[in-house]
Amino acid sequence: WQYKPTGISTDYQFRSYDRNCINLAASVVMPDAADANKLLFDKYAAGWAYASDANEVYINVWNYGPGWSIEVTENGKSLSVSKASSSLYRDPLHLYVYQIKTFKSSTSETFATSSCGHMWMVTASSPTSTLEIKVSDPFGNVYTETMTRPKQLDVETYRK
């Protein structure tokens, strides 16, 4: 079995995020929204609702399960991959594309961004280093990305 993204090949099984380029604080992404909406959005966006310069990269492997593996290298050196903090379980691109629009005018969670348990992270040594990401499934399929950083969080960057 494979996860099949809508309108995208089954060869696309994960998405990577450069945390240095993500600040989903309501004051930044919806400055004109009502204060109650901003407060709720910041709580909802949790770990994405502030700026960071920690050189962390997050990898959302949608179909991750037993037998999968994630390897990341920076300049030929392996980086330690760990499970992301639960405050970073919501996919930041989904928050950016869908939830900002919703929370600008409402406090209801229409088309809510679900919390996921398949978000992983590594810490790079530099904000401009290129990472090689390799994700393998238990069936021998290998999915790769050369992640050039900085990698902005916007629709065009992630359009396939």
Task: Identify the meaning behind each predicted range.
Residues W1-K160:
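Metal-dependent phosphoesterase/phosphodiesterase active-site architecture
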